[in-house]
Amino acid sequence: RDGAELRCANGSKLRARYVVSAVPFSVLREIDITPALRGDQADAVKRMPYHNQSQVWLRAKKPYWEEDGIEASMWSDGPFTLIRQQIEHDGTRELMSVLAFGPNSRRLDKLPPAERGRIALDYIHKVRPSTVGRLELVGTHSWELVPTIRGCSHQFVPGRGVAWSRAMALPHERLHFAGEHVRRLEVGMESAMETGERAALQILEKLSA
């Protein structure tokens, strides 16, 4: 009654007066919470789906877009939805992110990283011949394969959007919620950080009462 206890995977225990959880619901639903969540909040944590994004990162050794005169980034209806050139703050244009979503990403994730890279390069070479010999693999990443995240971003299911959005960020006993999944605006990590500020202010208000 005077605080909360967290039991960690390594067996250690932590105690605090209040807890802020930014754990995605894709992972939170597998963590025991006592007393249990209730109503629409419990339903959101249990059933909210997450979509995946599998990434292959490439480096352009030469500016292939200057050879064929076409914008470097591309949309595709093939296995990779988006081939996106990263433009850094200093104007560097070497890095390319190759993104697969949904079923395409899950098929890709079953393969070793090197094989994912090979498939991405083969596909880009096929649809954009000017890239042959001008791209090299840097690495791969999949949000769904990260055990503490298990998905790129959350989705609302039909008929539950209003109920979930109203309930899922509400404090539960001494547990408060933050993170991109309880943001109110779709403006990236800035909005996710705002949820942390909101949770902190909720706790400060309780501490000062």
Question: Which sequence ranges carry the predicted segments?
Answer:
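Glycine-centered loop/turn positions within well-structured domains
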Residues: 4, 12, 26
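Solvent-exposed residues in well-ordered beta-strands and their adjoining turns
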Residues: 9, 59-61, 101
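Core beta-strand elements of the Rossmann-like FAD/NAD(P) dinucleotide-binding domain
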Residues: 9-18
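Flavin (primarily FAD) binding-site architecture
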Residues: 18-40, 57
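Short glycine/proline- and charge-enriched loop/turn segments
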Residues: 35-42, 154-158
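Central beta-strand plus flanking loop segment that forms part of the substrate or channel wall
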Residues: 40-68
